[in-house]
């Protein structure tokens, strides 16, 4: 009995410590974003005073272009998510449900391509994008992002689809349903948790991507939030930590809230495919 109580106490302490470690960066980011004078970070003599000035500046200062960065990130990430999940759903269904020669090599090939680091592809991609005249356009980020997020999406959905009984497909085809109709009316509704978790992970990955956005965009017309925040500068070239943190809060907190609200579906979508019979 004492051992069980001790284990329970240790688990609770571990969970609390983990929560503190995970939440501390966000809490600190919020604290600094409301600071009137961020120099309190390095001097105990500077009093902490809260203000909304940093948020007002980020949203209204025309030199920062933050609303444009946020719009670009949302549009690109949304398009990438829609495309990636759609393509990976079709591919995962074909590999998991249709017998054809070499089908098992497809996920291995896709996974192998994803093992190449981004930096090794940047030079070739930039030359290709430059020849197409896509530098500083949505296309310059859209297509690389789709290729970059497709392996993750395919593997998650493939592991989930593989656990669904094939009797469902056979019953649907006996009733005269085509493969596409079977996918859209039976498989996808049953795979809602996996689809949702995949879509959220793809959206976050595309929203937070930095390297391609830094190299393939030149100004606010196509630049995304991570690069835009990294390039924030004050009047004299200093880093405006208050504005940086305010912009980070605006762009990060909605994603965190969304992940917390739908964590049940995310966890079930990521784990169900790994459990036999799920």
Curated annotation (Swiss-Prot):
It is found in: Cell membrane. GO terms for cellular component: ATP-binding cassette (ABC) transporter complex. This is Trehalose/maltose transport system permease protein MalG. The gene is malG. Residues 70-262 form the ABC transmembrane type-1 domain. Belongs to the binding-protein-dependent transport system permease family. Part of the ABC transporter complex MalEFGK involved in trehalose/maltose import. Responsible for the translocation of the substrate across the membrane. It is a multi-pass membrane protein. InterPro entries: BP-dep_ABC_trans_perm, MetI-like, MetI-like_sf. PROSITE patterns: ABC_TM1 (PS50928). Signal peptide: none annotated. SUPFAM superfamilies: MetI-like (SSF161098). Keywords: Cell membrane, Membrane, Sugar transport, Transmembrane, Transmembrane helix, Transport. One of its GO terms (biological process) is transmembrane transport. It comes from the Archaea. The chain crosses the membrane at residues 12-32, 74-94, 106-126, 141-161, 186-206, 242-262. The complex is composed of two ATP-binding proteins (MalK), two transmembrane proteins (MalG and MalF) and a solute-binding protein (MalE).
């Amino acid at each position: 009995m004492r051992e069980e109580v001790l284990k329970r106490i240790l688990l609770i302490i571990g969970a609390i410590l983990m929560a503190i470690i995970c939440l501390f960066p966000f809490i600190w980011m919020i604290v600094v974003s409301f600071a009137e004078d961020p120099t309190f970070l390095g001097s105990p003599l500077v009093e902490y005073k809260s203000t909304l000035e940093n948020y007002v500046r980020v949203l209204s200062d025309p030199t920062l272009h933050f609303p444009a960065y946020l719009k670009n990130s949302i549009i690109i990430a949304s398009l990438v998510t829609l495309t990636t999940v759609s393509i990976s759903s079709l591919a995962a269904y074909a590999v998991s449900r249709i017998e054809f020669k070499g089908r098992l090599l497809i996920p291995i090939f896709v996974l192998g391509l994803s093992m190449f680091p981004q930096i090794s592809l940047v030079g070739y991609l930039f030359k290709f994008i430059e020849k197409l005249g896509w530098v500083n356009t949505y296309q310059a980020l859209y297509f690389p992002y789709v290729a970059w997020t497709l392996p993750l999406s395919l593997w998650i959905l493939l592991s989930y689809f593989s656990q669904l009984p094939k009797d469902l497909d056979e019953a649907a085809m006996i009733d005269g349903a085509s493969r596409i109709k079977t996918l859209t009316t039976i498989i996808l509704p049953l795979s809602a948790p996996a689809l949702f978790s995949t879509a959220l992970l793809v959206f976050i990955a595309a929203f937070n991507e930095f390297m391609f956005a830094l190299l393939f965009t030149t100004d606010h017309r196509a630049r995304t939030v991570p690069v835009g925040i990294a390039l924030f500068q004050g009047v004299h070239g200093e880093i405006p930590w208050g504005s940086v943190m305010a912009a980070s809060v605006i762009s990060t907190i909605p994603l965190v809230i969304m992940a917390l609200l739908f964590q049940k579906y995310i966890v079930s979508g990521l784990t169900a495919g790994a459990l036999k019979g799920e």
